[in-house]
Amino acid sequence: MIYTSKKIIIFLFTIMQLAILASCMDSGYRLSFPEIDDLADEYPAQAKVFLSRADSNDNKGYYKLLTAKIEYQLKGYIYKENDIDDAINIFVNEKDEPLLARSLYYKGASILNNYRDTAKAIKWFAKAIAYDSNMREKEKLDMYNILCRITHQNIYTVELEDEARQ
């Protein structure tokens, strides 16, 4: 009886240790970069968590693009512009036009939001437009909305200047 109860206690203790050990381990569930990319469109905070679990060496350019995209979506600006610059260089070398177009868009958006330099931003958007047939629809629409907003602001500014001259 005592021998059996010791076996039961040891067995239960072993099961508890395994449960605790399993709960402390990483789940191991990782999303691929395209899945994280899709998730970032609607839920950038959750995408950031999955991106932190991803191996940045799998596809450095895509990883850096997603880092910049998620940061831009969460904060409205890109703090580390060297990530997007690295992504652009990688995609130019790999001749990956869809990801290059998206990287150029985020570079232009970053310049516009960080420095309010409309002329430089438009130059980057113009480079992205050269590849826009390969861009994702959401980013293409966002880019054209930004360009329309810039155009509208410029027209409004010209109208105000004309009124001021009169």
Q: For each of these PLM feature ranges, what is it?
A:
Residues 11-20:
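Bacterial N-terminal signal peptides
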Residues 24-166:
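A "functional boundary" signal
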